[in-house]
């Protein structure tokens, strides 16, 4: 397939295909292309932080929604806490069981070579432009999430269709 050829051309060892595709598919569902690298770094940082603030949980809406058979929107609070959804990265630490889509080569490249950074969080604060803010602390994330909430208060129809936050 095209994806397998891309992985081979990028010199990804076959034993890493599953992990790379899983990470890249999440990156692609979560953020616009210009933020792929930063989102890939967030995933790496969260996976590495098993004893820290995030406890190795990705906490990505896109994975929860995939497990529910949906894309776009925001999981309801009870959906985000449901342990029966194996793709619920709010509950289950580490990567979900598999990819949540077929990622682009750009998303794969971002996962293979994420930029340096201490980011643990991100939130898309403008759903029209895709503007996404990255942060290293839960306090910074709370301030950024307030920006999304302010945007949503003025753009209810847009926000009811979805939020991207990780």
What is each residue range found by the language model?
Residues 1-166:
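Bacterial extracytoplasmic/cell-wall-associated proteins, especially those involved in peptidoglycan
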């Amino acid at each position: 397939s095209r994806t397998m050829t891309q992985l081979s051309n990028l010199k990804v060892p076959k034993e890493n295909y599953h992990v790379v595709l899983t990470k890249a598919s999440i990156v692609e569902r979560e953020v616009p292309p210009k933020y792929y690298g930063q989102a890939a770094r967030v995933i790496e940082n969260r996976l590495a932080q098993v004893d820290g603030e995030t406890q190795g949980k990705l906490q990505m809406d896109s994975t929860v929604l995939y497990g529910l058979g949906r894309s776009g929107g925001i999981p309801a609070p009870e959906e985000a806490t449901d342990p029966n959804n194996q793709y619920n990265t709010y509950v289950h630490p580490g990567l979900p069981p598999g990819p949540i889509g077929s990622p682009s080569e750009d998303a794969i490249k971002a996962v293979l070579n994420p930029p340096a950074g201490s980011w643990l969080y991100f939130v898309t604060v403008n759903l029209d432009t895709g503007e996404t803010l990255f942060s290293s602390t839960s306090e910074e994330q709370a301030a950024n999430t307030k920006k999304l909430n302010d945007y949503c208060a003025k753009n209810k129809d847009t926000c009811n269709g979805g939020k991207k936050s990780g």
